[in-house]
Amino acid sequence: STFFDAVWEVHYNSSRTGIRLIGPKPEWARSDGGEAGMHPSNIHDNAYAIGTIDFTGDMPVILGPDGPSLGGFVCPATVIHADLWKLGQLKAGDKLRFIPVSIETASDIARSQEQTIHSLTHESTDYLALGVDAILKQSPIIKKVEASESTEQVVYRPSGDRYLLIEYGPLTLDIRLRFRVHALMLWLERNSLKGILELTPGIRSLQVHYDALALPLSELMAHLKTAESELENIDNLCLPSRTVHLP
């Protein structure tokens, strides 16, 4: 709530790589990042979405199209796809606020925007009338599958309305989890859905970039459920590899 209540100022050191923001220092729920680093903002590397608000230490940065696609910092929110154009209008000293919306609302806004572009007629959307308090009370986890004797824990988190982050296991470095991520990526490449745009693996995670207007989240989640049921036990996993001979 502190993040969404604050009025942020655009830092002078901003570009297409990222828009730095000046505002209140966050109160962290932990003292450090565990295995990932000394600062509480540190996590094991996972993929970033364009428009993600990335806390590099205590300063948030809105990652732009020329920003990193992978990194080791926490990201509490992501600018929705329909509002990405606004990032290009910001300049040093501008003030802004973030307003949380549901995935369904984000898709409605994107669909309305597409209709506006094609019909050249404008329909206004009142963000403040969309139930902000209700959104803040929702968990950022849309699905969690507990670990069993043959499977790892899986957590699904949206990153904005066009990206889905899939995380395996606990927050530890484990080559088994990396293998599981790679196996899922290979399965999705073999069984691709129309609307999946890009797959970006991390250490223990995989981010799926998809077109929400062509591929609803519910359909993507059903596809991922099928993937988990078809993937082999990680102990029996066999992945292609290669030998490189150096001169």
Regions found by a protein language model. Name each.
Residues 1-247:
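Glycine-rich active-site loops that engage anionic ligands at enzyme catalytic sites
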